């Protein structure tokens, strides 16, 4: 039986190819979302370049409606990279609080129809986009904050930081090998939950 899986995230969900300066994507055959699109899963990719954790009521409402109307049996949410990258003074704990507010709204609207898998992105590494060691240290705290959030909300959690996801030269975006490793990690997480 083919189930719907909605993947809600940023450029790493979108499939951004960091070798492209104009927002290009990896071929579909490379993207982790497409690798999960099998006879078991019909994957809906709702990744967007530059997306951060939603904070405005209108943005949250639109996202919640997208998730609810998809009627997906499972929803993977992976955000937070842009928050920490673009706001150097932002603490990982604040990302956790923002994520909790967003996911509370999702849970109210979906009323348990969808299994939510909150996924902490793999930590950034020094690269063309990442030079401040403080940003990298904060990123290493994000998984713990998200795990606490998931526990409080009673939803599933996965830490992509333990999946060996290779990042490209910029220290932020998945390489082709990274997409494959991430797809395997998500598949394992979903298999253990459903």
Segment roles from a protein language model:
Residues 107-115:
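A short helix->loop->beta-strand "cap" motif at the edges of active sites that frequently abuts
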Residues 170-194:
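Histidine-centered active-site loop/cap adjacent to the catalytic His
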Residues 123-159:
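Substrate-gating cap/lid alpha-helix
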Residues 2-6, 12-104, 127-129, 137-141, ...:
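Conserved SGNH/GDSL esterase-like catalytic core that processes O-acyl groups on lipids
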Residues 45-47, 119, 159-161:
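Residue-level recognition of beta-strand->loop/alpha-helix junctions
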Residues 42-44, 114, 154-156:
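Conserved beta-strand segments of alpha/beta enzyme cores
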Residues 8-9, 118:
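Short hydrophobic segments within beta-strands
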Residues 67-71, 110-111, 193:
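Glycine-rich phosphate-binding loop signature in dinucleotide/nucleotide-binding domains
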């Amino acid at each position: 039986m083919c189930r719907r899986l909605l993947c809600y995230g940023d450029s790493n969900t979108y499939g951004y190819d960091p070798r492209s300066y104009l927002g290009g994507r990896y071929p579909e055959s490379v993207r982790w979302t497409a690798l999960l699109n099998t006879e078991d899963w019909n994957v809906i990719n709702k990744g967007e370049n530059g997306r951060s954790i939603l904070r405005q009521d209108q943005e949250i409402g639109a996202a919640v409606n997208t998730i609810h109307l998809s009627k997906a049996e499972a929803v993977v949410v992976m955000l937070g990279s842009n928050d920490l990258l673009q706001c150097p003074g932002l603490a990982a704990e604040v990302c956790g609080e923002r994520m909790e507010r967003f996911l509370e709204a999702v849970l109210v609207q979906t009323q348990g129809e969808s299994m939510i898998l909150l996924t902490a992105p793999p930590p950034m590494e020094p690269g063309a986009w990442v030079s401040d060691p403080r940003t990298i240290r904060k990123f290493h705290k994000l998984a713990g904050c998200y795990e606490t959030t998931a526990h409080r909300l009673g939803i599933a959690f996965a830490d992509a930081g333990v999946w060996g996801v290779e990042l490209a030269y910029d220290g932020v975006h998945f390489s082709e090998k990274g997409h494959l490793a991430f797809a395997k990690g998500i598949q394992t997480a979903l298999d253990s939950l459903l």
